[in-house]
From Swiss-Prot:
Signal peptide: none annotated. The gene is CDC48. SMART domains: AAA (SM00382), CDC48_N (SM01073). This is Cell division control protein 48. ATP binds at P251, G252, T253, G254, K255, T256, L257, N352, H388. It comes from Encephalitozoon cuniculi (strain GB-M1). Its main location: endoplasmic reticulum. Belongs to the AAA ATPase family. The lineage of its organism: Eukaryota, Fungi, Fungi incertae sedis, Microsporidia, Unikaryonidae.
Length: 780
């Protein structure tokens, strides 16, 4: 066991920095550096075996790289590197990011011709000669290294101008990526380029834009990046690299984003295939389009062929209606089999319905690996939230960690939508200060735009997780304080549902699996439904309420499918409370014959198998409520399914007082009203009965108010001069209401519930004979 504990986990090794030339970016004393220089501490220079003024190649993100000259700076911390603002922009990095540094051993070619484009918005207001004022002073350093495609900024007394290097030609008239500028370099200025075009190039998706799936990204990078970059690893060890990877998971979890990020970071050619683009009404043309896509990818290798929604392009042939779909599946199989082992082409497929794909595709040699890109957990969601808010102006009161705790079940696209809605709400708040007909917006208004916590609160209330949009999802606003009495039941529910969500580490410590379900049983009107809603609210879980008949369907197999889909959606939105009201309608004791109850029996079997944990439940809690527990199938009530059987009895005296206080907490009451006296007069009344008494009393007060006002109108009195005739609820209203009150639960029914509750208890006295234990199983 000790050896197993000390084993190193290599599953995410590809994500770790493994070389001494990895440095942390900082901006210490950047004012002492020129555009083409980087600052390093002398000890770091020694470690890397570098001298001052050596040329180094620095790798940033998304395949960005630049050549710099080194400068020794004591102020830069060891293992850090100071890079000027333009350099950080070109490398797509920020302060505290890491970069890799390599010595440039060969000479950098001298640039004979240099073409550049000024960025339009930086030269619009410049009146002087741009070349003389900005470009010539900038290029006045001998052997200054530049990189094609990079943006450089020059500041003078007239302002700041930025330009993009578009082309560099060496002495042999060849285009080069890196080169050094000298006094002999010919410089050509072309037309201007817009800021939008520049940002479009620099805003490519990279690994840093993908969050919430660290383990999956490690697997994908192993399977895609290694064969594309270092195929010799596979040939040396004597195995073939993978040909295809299938990414599956709910919509909006980042499958397409991952494919684009890998293509950009590896520099691979990305060929995107969408089903409708391949399909053609002409016979044989669809297969031809598919062949052309693979041929194009092989010509541009290393390449990634990304087939989005592959289930539409390659469905199961035995279930496919059209001949075209069958031929396309066959063609895809042939093309994947015909791919050369080391052709530097990888096929990525994405789907949210993996079981709809033809099984012939899902074998080794075709789609070798299947990786689930699921709904992110709490850590993943926070990572994604930080990605979506990294460029957002936010006020100091925004606490992303606290916001994240309320976003159970949100996918990456849901979180993007949430951030967008929060920003939009901030703009709405500023609209009264904005003249929409004016060409420009006041600079003060623009400067005051900051997304605050209230904007996020609004966005949370108006954004639902996409996995639950098909289901009628409720966000109950019922708290423990809204439910009178039942203190022992509330504590039991906290331990069963709330604790596994809030304190999962405690369950791991004691090696215990949390309970899967709770059954509320008892007389009608005692607060079973209300308790389920309070549980969901208090543990900030999603809440899905299901009525039995909603799941029934006239088609064979459809009812069971509805239950499967329901649990799948609940798992996607975990932690989630599934509340089956009147569960006896779909979980009656099985009859054992093939009569009309066959559909109900099949539904019960499906419900049992879902609750048995055949599929991992991921904090999905099932709460059933019934007032006919004797009719439920006994298999449903065993441990491992509905673990906790909670009897919700008629309220006792203290509980009745609490219920009356909760019901009347927003009602103005006369000081003469004694709720305890009212509770004593309503023995054996359920919570619903007490609520009805209070409602009827309030109706009487409202009736009295309206009748008085109508009477005064007839007399011609002014309404403004009238005093409120009924300022609060009086004792006589309650007395009048009590005269028509009735109990909804008879003595006979109460006895039946209590007999059932006794039958489900264990006689603890047989186990512990040393102590006196009362009938409730408590020590006296």
């Amino acid at each position: 066991m000790a050896a197993a504990a000390n084993e190193k986990d290599f599953s995410t090794a590809i994500l770790e920095s493994k070389t001494k030339n990895t440095l942390i970016v900082c901006d210490k004393d950047c004012s002492k550096l020129r555009t083409y220089q980087v600052g390093l501490h002398p000890t770091t220079l020694n470690e890397l075996e570098l001298f001052e003024s050596d040329y180094v190649r620095i790798l940033g993100k998304k395949k960005a790289e630049l050549i710099f000259s080194t400068v020794a700076l004591e102020s830069v911390p060891p293992r850090h590197i100071a890079i000027v603002r333009d350099g950080r922009f070109n490398l797509r990095i920020r302060i505290t990011d890491t970069v890799k540094l390599y010595r440039v051993d060969k000479d950098i070619p001298v640039v004979s011709k240099l073409n550049f484009l000024p960025i339009k918005d930086t030269v619009e207001n410049i009146r002087g000669n741009i070349f003389d004022e900005f470009v010539r002073p900038f290029l006045d350093f001998n052997f200054m290294p530049l990189t094609t495609g990079s943006i450089y900024g020059v500041t003078s007394g007239l302002g700041r101008v930025e330009f993009k290097v578009t082309k560099m030609i060496d002495a042999q008239d060849m285009e080069i990526k890196h080169g050094s500028v000298t006094s002999t370099t010919s410089v050509y200025c072309d037309e201007t380029i817009s800021r939008e075009e520049v940002e479009k190039e620099f805003n490519m998706v990279g690994y840093d834009d993908v969050g919430g799936c660290r383990a999956q990204m490690a697997k994908i990078r192993e399977l895609v990046e290694l064969p594309l970059r270092h195929s010799q690893l596979y040939s040396k060890i004597g195995v073939k690299p993978p040909k295809g990877i299938l990414l599956y998971g709910p919509p909006g979890t980042g499958k397409t984003l991952i494919a684009r990020a890998i293509a950009n970071e590896t520099g691979a050619f990305l060929f995107l295939i969408n089903g409708p683009e391949i399909m053609s009404k002409m016979a044989g043309e669809s297969e031809s389009n598919l062949r052309k896509a693979f041929e194009e990818a092989e010509k541009n290798s290393p390449a990634i062929i990304f087939i989005d929604e592959i289930d539409a392009l390659a469905p199961k042939r035995e279930k496919s209606q059209g001949e075209v779909e069958r031929r396309i599946v066959s063609q895809l199989l042939t093309l994947m089999d015909g791919m050369k082992a080391r052709s530097n082409v990888i096929v990525l497929g994405a789907t949210n319905r993996p079981n709809s794909i033809d099984p012939a595709l899902r074998r080794y040699g075709r789609f070798d690996r299947e990786i689930e890109i699921g709904v992110p957990d709490e850590t993943g969601r926070l990572e994604i939230l930080r990605i979506h808010t990294k460029n957002m102006k936010m006020s100091e009161d925004v606490d992303l960690v606290a916001i994240n705790k309320e976003l159970h079940g949100f996918t990456g696209s849901d979180l993007a939508s949430l951030c967008s809605e929060a920003a939009l709400q901030q703009i709405r708040e500023k609209l009264p200060q904005i003249d929409l007909d004016s060409e420009k917006i006041d600079a003060k208004v623009l400067a005051s735009l900051k997304v605050n916590s209230e904007n996020f609160r609004y966005a949370i209330e108006h954004t639902d997780p996409s996995s639950l949009r098909e289901t009628v999802i409720q966000s109950p606003n019922v708290k423990w304080s809204d439910i009178g009495g039942l203190e022992q039941v509330k504590q039991e529910l906290r331990e069963t549902v709330q604790y596994p969500v809030e304190y999962p580490e405690k369950f791991i410590k004691f090696g215990m699996t949390p309970a899967k379900g709770v059954l509320f049983y008892g007389p009608p009107g005692c607060g079973k439904t209300l308790l389920a809603k309070a549980v969901a609210t208090e543990c900030k879980a999603n809440f899905i309420s299901i009525k039995g008949p909603e799941l029934l369907s006239m088609w064979v197999g459809e009812s069971e499918s509805n239950i499967r889909d329901l649990f799948a959606r609940a798992r996607g939105a975990a932690p989630c409370v599934l509340f089956f009201d009147e569960i006896d309608s779909i979980a009656k004791a099985r009859s054992g014959n093939d009569g009309s109850s066959g559909a109900t029996d099949r539904m019960l079997n499906q419900l049992l198998s879902e609750m048995d944990g055949i599929n991992q439940k991921k904090n999905v809690f099932v709460i059933g409520a019934t007032n006919r527990p004797d009719q439920l199938d006994s298999a449903l009530m065993r441990p491992g399914r509905l673990d906790q059987l909670v009897y919700i009895p008629l309220p006792d005296l203290d509980s009745r007082v609490s219920i009356l206080q909760a019901t009347l907490k927003k009602t103005p009451l006369s000081p003469e009203i004694d709720l305890r006296q009212l509770a004593e007069a309503t023995d054996k009344f359920s919570g619903a009965d007490l609520s009805e008494i209070c409602q009827r009393a309030c109706k009487l007060a409202i009736r009295e108010t309206i009748e008085y006002e109508l009477e005064q109108k007839k007399k011609g009195s002014e309404m403004m001069d009238l005093e409120d005739p009924v300022p609060y609820l009086r004792p006589d209203h309650l007395v009048q209401s009590l005269k028509t009150a009735r109990r909804s639960v008879s003595e006979k029914e109460v006895e039946r519930y209590e007999a059932f509750a006794r039958s489900m208890k264990v006689d603890v006295r047989k186990f512990d004979k040393k102590n006196d234990i009362n009938d409730d199983g408590l020590y006296e």
